[in-house]
Structure formats: structure tokens, C-alpha cells
Amino acid sequence: METKRSKLYLLTLGCSKNMVDSEVLLAQAKANQIYLAEDFHEADTILINTCGFIDKSKQESIDQILEAIRFKEAKRIKKVIVFGCLSERYKDALREEIPEVDCYFGTRDLSQIIAELGGHYKTHLLGERELLTPPYFSYLKISEGCDHPCAFCAIPLMRGKQVSRPIDELLLEAKKLKEKGVRELCLIAQDTTYYGHDLNGKRQLAELLQRLSDLQFDWIRLLYAYPAMFPTDILPVMRERENICKYLDLPLQHVSDEMLKSMRRGISKRKTTELIAQIRSEVPGIRLRTTMLVGYPNETEEQFSELVEFVRETQFDRLGCFAYSHEEGTEAHELPDTLTEEEKERRVELLMAAQEEIAYAKNQALVGSFMPVLIERFEANFAIGRTEYDAPEVDNEVVIALDEAEQKKVKVGTFYQARITDAEAFDLFGSLVL
């Protein structure tokens, strides 16, 4: 007797790594002829891929679970299934607090989820994904988990130790993405630069980049690079391969030596400064993105000022900043959360104000230059796109005014040469060169 298949609506919360997990699950569901609903109104089952990174993420996940429960109680759906990071970490507590959820799964339970939906996990679908991104770009998750002991981070509690995927497996998946029309490939992991060390005792990111470059994607972008023990052998590859973006996402978190030691980041301010200088020297024209964490336990005003001054001196091209979240189970949770939320937000605003000045000056320097732009969408008479130096969703956009003839020619997912005509801190403006 055949098991009845579900009509599935999948809600994905959190980061791009979660999105890839959802894409793999959707490919399995589709292969099992499970109906994939575009709207929860069409579904009998809501599946929620949760995030548990910080308090704000946890609350969003819980709010969505409770909303799904209300749909179930109103008999608009039959079943609610929860999986992902929040469920991995707090499965027992969630079962006790929200028993109305039918099933809780963790981050490694794909086959069990498919079985719960009435299907069977198909091992031959290696590398198959139903893309949730636009068809012209995609993420490639090169490893799972993390071996670093950062005191503030709960990721190892949810994702476990690092497990790198074999190069041949990644190449197979990348080829399938290329066949789907993907032109920009963004490499992601908890730490991309540690890739391969668990496979044969040595890191293999340089080799992976070379072999992916050979597949002739237009852009290959490296995200989530860890600064400690940075594999400098990737720098010649980034310099010499034209389709590897001259862009690096290098989250530093802080530069005060006292803060770095307490955070257990494994690097000093001096080593950080030397690394940035080496990257910029070996890859001329590279754009650096970083992320900073302020309001960490016992961060003094002097240490925060040191961070702001470092940002001004270093002149990062892109920068994000987060207020510290006191996460239970982490080493930092044993420290007193010394700063108020208001003070943390004040520091975020001050640091971002400093970065805004830097970003404005850097963008103004681009006025009059020409660069390729990947068009992503249209708004009224404008085409919106990104340059090689901007990652999806987090960085600058280029706003291009189109005349009537251009509106008929320009297509989403296509590269066009653009002349930059004006700039703000976080946006460029331009015209097409057709």
C-alpha cells in the first residue's frame, strides 16, 4: 500500500547555509512526487527550517512555529514539522513547550524528514537541489560544522565539528548548478578557509577554487573566510583566475588583543593587520568585507574606540556590525553581560557611522568608471544589479536608469557594462553602455 504523500510548504529562516539545506530537501521531496506548494494555503503540511544563532533569530523561529500552530488549530493545515538549528539545539525543550508540533528534527535528519512526508530518501540524487535563489546565482556549501572555539558562538552546538565535502562531490554539484543556468557561485561554510583539513590533514581551498574556476562560471565568490591561520596559497589563485571575484568576506569580530583573546579568535591585532596588508598586496584591487561584534562582555570604551579607529585606518570596502548576544551554552555565557542593550546599539551605530563615511568616499571614487553589472531585478524604469565587488543581499547595489529602448533589451540574470554616474554610501548609480 502506497503511503499518502504530503502537500508541502517549506519556510526557511536564517542564513544561506540553511537555504542550501532546504534546497536539498526540496529536491528529495520533488523526486518523491511530494507536492511543493508556493503558498501555505495550498499545503496540508508546513515545514519550518529554523535558525538558532542569536536571540533575535530564535524568537523569529518560535514566532513562525506558533503562527503555523494557529493555522493547524484552525484546520487550515494538518501537520507542522520543525527542523534545523533551533530544533537541533533545543529539541527536548521545544517538545515540552510547544507539543502541538507534530515532529521535531535536527540538522542532520533529512532522510527521516522525507520518510515523515511519505517518501523515501534517494541516495542517487547527490548534488541535486531545487534552487530558492534566482536562477543566475547560487550557493555551494563546501563543508558543515566548525572546529573553532569562538567563545561567543553556538554554531558548533548546532552543527557539530567541521566535515568537509570531497572535491569530486562539490564539482558534481557545481556542474549541475551550471547546467541550471547559474552564473555566480558563492562558496559558503561556517569557515571556508579551513576546507579540507579533515579530509586528508591539509587544507584544499586553493585546489577547490582552481577546479571550480575551470568550470567557467562568470563569478566565483568566497564568503565566510576565517582570519586565523588563513591559507595564503589561495591568494595567487584569486589574483590569476579572472572568474574568481576580487572580493573576500573576512569576518574579524574585533581587533583589541584583550577582546580577541577573550573571544578565543586565535589571532592578534598585529597578525590581523599583517594579513590584510598581504591580501591587498597579493591581490591588487581586491575588496574586503568584514563583520564586527561590539558589546562583548567587558568591552571597555577604550577597546571599542580602538576598534573604530582600526576601521577608519584600514578602510574596509564593506562592513557589517552586530551587537553581542548572550548565548547559553557558549563560553562567553559564563562571563557577565556587562553592557546594556542600549549601549550595545549605540556602539553599533557609531561604528556603522564611521563605515558609512568610508563607504561614501570609496563609492564616490568610482564615479566615471566602467564595470560589469549583473542585473537582478527591475523597479519602475530602473534596472538594479551588483558588481563583482558586491555579494548578494548584503552589499551595494547599482541602480541604472533605462530609456524605453533599453527596457526592451535588458534582461535579468545578464551582465552589462555600466558607467557609474553617481554614488551614495551604499548604492551606486549608473547608465548602461550597450
Swiss-Prot record:
[4Fe-4S] cluster 2 binds at C146, C150, C153. Belongs to the methylthiotransferase family. RimO subfamily. One of its GO terms (cellular component) is cytosol. It catalyses: L-aspartate(89)-[ribosomal protein uS12]-hydrogen + (sulfur carrier)-SH + AH2 + 2 S-adenosyl-L-methionine = 3-methylsulfanyl-L-aspartate(89)-[ribosomal protein uS12]-hydrogen + (sulfur carrier)-H + 5'-deoxyadenosine + L-methionine + A + S-adenosyl-L-homocysteine + 2 H(+). Residues 364-434 form the TRAM domain. SMART domains: Elp3. Residues 132-361 form the Radical SAM core domain. [4Fe-4S] cluster 1 binds at C15, C51, C85. InterPro entries: Elp3/MiaA/NifB-like_rSAM (IPR006638), Methylthiotransferase (IPR005839), Methylthiotransferase_CS (IPR020612), Methylthiotransferase_N (IPR013848), Methylthiotransferase_N_sf (IPR038135), NA-bd_OB-fold (IPR012340), Ribosomal_uS12_MeSTrfase_RimO (IPR005840), rSAM (IPR007197). It is found in: Cytoplasm. It comes from Chloroherpeton thalassium (strain ATCC 35110 / GB-78). Its cofactor is [4Fe-4S] cluster. GO terms for molecular function: 4 iron, 4 sulfur cluster binding; aspartic acid methylthiotransferase activity; metal ion binding; protein methylthiotransferase activity. Binds 2 [4Fe-4S] clusters. One cluster is coordinated with 3 cysteines and an exchangeable S-adenosyl-L-methionine. The keyword Flavoprotein does not apply. It is an enzyme of class 2 (transferase). This is Ribosomal protein uS12 methylthiotransferase RimO.
